[in-house]
């Protein structure tokens, strides 16, 4: 893991790094030392590790004592994009423009990314937990939309993850992995989501095998998640990662 920059403000330290070809950012409380809970933060489709919502959420968590890490998903942000991914995203945009339901199209894109994303996250988790200011503490995952689509296969495969905040995605292509998830989950649904049909979101929630799972449903479209849900997710992680 090679760090390229470090800044601190408002009690939070932000460090940019690369691990092999994976670019990422680590947020920790300023002057942090010793083991603490770690949250893996997955960004949405077409976004990147320093999208405004990702940074705001990460800083909120870090200000309360958590370590938080975000990486660019395959073919996003500072990572190279291949021709196949370009073809898939072009088909997705064309399908949505033609009025097709995006569920199956989005699932195809996530499937193309998921196997590499899982390997990337597992490598990042191992590397970050070797740092003195993070250590081998409890781990959570937070991801909406594509962050959920890539997070579900990760959580199903990675026993170090003990709790997750997910949502804004349907069940297409995810039922089998969701059925392997037994950790506590907080799941968000936007009731008027124009990208993900409500019944598909609810079907994904239902497919999760977690004995403890809660559904947070709010009115509004895909990007209209109320800001108070960040605080709610913080309390969820504080309960399960303390």
Question: What are the language-model segments listed below?
Answer:
Residues 54-55, 183, 197-206:
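Short alpha-helix in the alpha/beta-hydrolase fold that links the catalytic acid
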Residues 1-34:
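N-terminal cap/lid segment of alpha/beta-hydrolase-fold proteins
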Residues 34-44:
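Short beta-strand element of the alpha/beta-hydrolase
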Residues 202, 206-223:
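Catalytic histidine neighborhood in serine/cysteine hydrolases
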Residues 116-180:
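Primarily recognizes the serine-hydrolase "nucleophile elbow" in alpha/beta-hydrolase
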């Amino acid at each position: 893991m090679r760090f390229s920059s470090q800044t601190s403000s408002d009690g939070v330290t932000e460090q940019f790094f690369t691990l092999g070809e994976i670019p990422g950012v680590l947020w920790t409380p300023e002057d942090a030392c010793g083991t603490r809970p770690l949250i893996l933060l997955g960004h949405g489709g077409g976004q990147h590790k320093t999208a405004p919502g990702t940074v705001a959420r990460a800083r909120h968590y870090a200000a309360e004592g958590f370590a938080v890490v975000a990486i660019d998903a395959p073919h996003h942000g500072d990572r190279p994009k291949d021709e196949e991914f370009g073809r898939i995203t072009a088909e997705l945009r064309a399908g949505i423009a033609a009025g097709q339901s995006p569920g199956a199209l989005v699932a195809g894109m996530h499937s193309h990314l998921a196997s590499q994303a899982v390997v990337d996250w597992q490598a990042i988790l191992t590397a970050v937990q070797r740092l003195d200011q993070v250590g081998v503490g409890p781990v959570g995952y937070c991801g909406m939309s594509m962050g959920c689509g890539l997070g579900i296969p990760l959580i199903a495969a990675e026993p170090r993850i003990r709790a997750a905040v997910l949502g804004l995605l349907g069940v297409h292509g995810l039922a089998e992995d969701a059925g392997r998830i037994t950790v506590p989950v907080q799941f968000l649904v936007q009731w008027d989501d124009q990208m993900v049909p409500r019944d598909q979101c609810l079907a994904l929630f239902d497919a999760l095998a977690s004995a403890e799972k809660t559904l947070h449903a709010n009115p509004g479209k895909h990007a209209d998640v109320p800001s108070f849900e960040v605080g709610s997710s913080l309390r969820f992680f504080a309960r399960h990662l303390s």
